[in-house]
């Protein structure tokens, strides 16, 4: 697609109906299966990684920071070391707007906005961003990090959609409540907004996919 041949690696393929739709899909559970990447990289002549794997619940990261540092940081370190070993020099990393914390202006304007994460989840993303800079300087691994806000939406053709267990995302929960005629609870009434409720920025998953393709092209052209 778009000149690229994607190969999917997931730790639990059998419970992921979305992944099962594709042909080149492999089940790998880090760290014990990381050696399996050797054959995949060589078989497909892979020269770039797109890493979207992470634990993402802010609340859980506060309750269980060890779980988040182990999965989001240590596992990423192992992946970078494997890239170094296999001479894979390009990676796109899914970071998060959580690295910003609470900006003094109340709005994140650009990449010069201060980075002050206020929870372990945000800290793990910022740590990996710093790791990527170090691996670029020392080993020539080039990277682009996207600081996503709230990813949402589904494939316009209806082939893939949101898939969380348990579901915690607001849009699918609202849709579910509407279809099942259930009440929907919206929490928070003391934010500095016109009605006191939280305002969030959303980015559609197809826009994310398009951005990742453009990022791959930039890496291929050695622009980043």
Stretches found by the model and what they are:
Residues 26-30, 189:
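Cofactor-binding loops of NAD(P)H-dependent oxidoreductases
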Residues 9, 49-53, 91-97, 146-151:
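SDR active-site strand-loop-helix element
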Residues 4-13:
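Conserved glycine-rich Rossmann-like NAD(P)H-binding loop of the short-chain dehydrogenase/reductase
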Residues 30-71:
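NAD(P)H-binding glycine-rich loop region in Rossmannoid oxidoreductase-like domains
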Residues 151-154, 172-193, 200-224:
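Alpha-helical substrate-binding/gating segment
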Residues 63-78, 85, 90, 99-145, ...:
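Catalytic helix-loop patch of NAD(P)-dependent Rossmann-fold dehydrogenases
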Residues 15-22:
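Short loop/helix-cap segments at secondary-structure boundaries that form the rim of catalytic
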Residues 34, 73-81, 206-209, 213:
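Conserved active-site region of classical short-chain dehydrogenase/reductase
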């Amino acid at each position: 697609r778009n000149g690229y041949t994607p190969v999917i690696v997931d730790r639990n393929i059998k419970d992921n109906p979305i992944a099962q739709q594709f042909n080149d899909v492999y089940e790998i559970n880090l760290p014990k299966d990381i050696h399996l990447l050797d054959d995949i990289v060589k078989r497909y002549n892979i020269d770039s990684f797109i890493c979207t794997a992470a634990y993402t619940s802010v609340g859980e990261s506060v309750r269980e920071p060890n779980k988040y540092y182990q999965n989001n940081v240590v596992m990423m370190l192992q992946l970078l070391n494997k890239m170094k070993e296999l001479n894979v020099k390009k990676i796109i990393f899914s970071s998060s707007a959580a690295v910003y914390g609470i900006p003094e202006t109340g709005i994140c304007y650009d990449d010069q906005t201060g980075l002050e994460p206020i929870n372990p989840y945000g800290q793990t993303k910022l740590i990996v961003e710093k790791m990527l800079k170090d691996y670029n300087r020392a080993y020539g691994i080039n990277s682009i990090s996207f600081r996503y806000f709230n990813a949402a939406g589904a494939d316009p053709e209806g082939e893939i959609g949101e898939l969380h267990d348990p579901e915690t995302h607001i849009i699918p929960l609202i849709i579910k409540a509407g279809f099942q005629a259930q009440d929907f609870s919206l929490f928070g009434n003391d934010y500095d907004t016109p009605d006191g409720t939280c305002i969030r920025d959303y980015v559609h998953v197809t826009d994310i996919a398009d951005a990742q393709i453009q990022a791959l092209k930039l890496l291929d052209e050695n622009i980043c």
